[in-house]
Amino acid sequence: EAGVSQADIKYASIYDSFTITVVMQIEDLGFCAKGDGGKFVSDGNLIAGVGKFPINTDGGGLCNNHPMNRGGMTKVIEAVRQLRGEANSVVQIPNCDIALAHGTGGGLGTRHGSATLIFERE
């Protein structure tokens, strides 16, 4: 375990194959209660600069056309950009010192898996 709580995480890159995927994952990761994900999102909590918990400041897979086999590396790249202060200035999270990258995958009807990485800037 990383020894951090959800409140410590300033930014998250979350796999977003579909809109509902984000809602399910923020609930499963404990950033809001089960069943409250839709309201959490519609209240603007995920928007950089104004929300409590900005995610996918690179636009995520839905914005980047979800290219085939883009994998979790794009999640790691944006998390590291945030930690280094190198994200686009419009979406840079001030004083971002802990970031999360989370992904799920697998073929439909076959094996599925997920991974969560937590990064800290020192």
Please identify what each model-predicted range represents.
Residues 1-122:
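Claisen-condensing/thiolase-fold acyl-transfer catalytic domains that form or cleave C-C bonds
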